[in-house]
Amino acid sequence: MEKLRMNVQGRVQGVGFRYMTKMVADQLGVTGSVRNEDDGSVSITAIAPEDIMETFIKKIKDSPSPAGRVTYVDIQEDPLLEETEQFKVIQ
């Protein structure tokens, strides 16, 4: 299992990015969370097998929201990330 933290920058707030990210995660079976940050970026924690994670990252980089636009994604491994049963949107 890969355990990653991502910080996504671009037009990612106010465009349905978090909810579309959850939809993609649910379709792929990725668990974790997504939340808006004060600096206008979005933070994602994600846990999935490597092949599924590759697909998830590609979809995030392409922006799951049609109105969104991703300009940069910082990805860090975090082996201490706690596993969850679902993917949730944090308000």
Swiss-Prot record:
Domain of life: Bacteria
Keyword Disulfide bond among record annotations: no
Keywords for this protein: Hydrolase
E.C. no: 3.6.1.7
Span of domain Acylphosphatase-like: 3-91
Keyword Hydrolase: yes
Active site: 18, 36
MF GO annotations: acylphosphatase activity
Reaction(s) the record says it catalyses: an acyl phosphate + H2O = a carboxylate + phosphate + H(+)
Family per similarity comment: Belongs to the acylphosphatase family.
Protein name: Acylphosphatase
Species of provenance: Enterococcus faecalis (strain ATCC 700802 / V583)
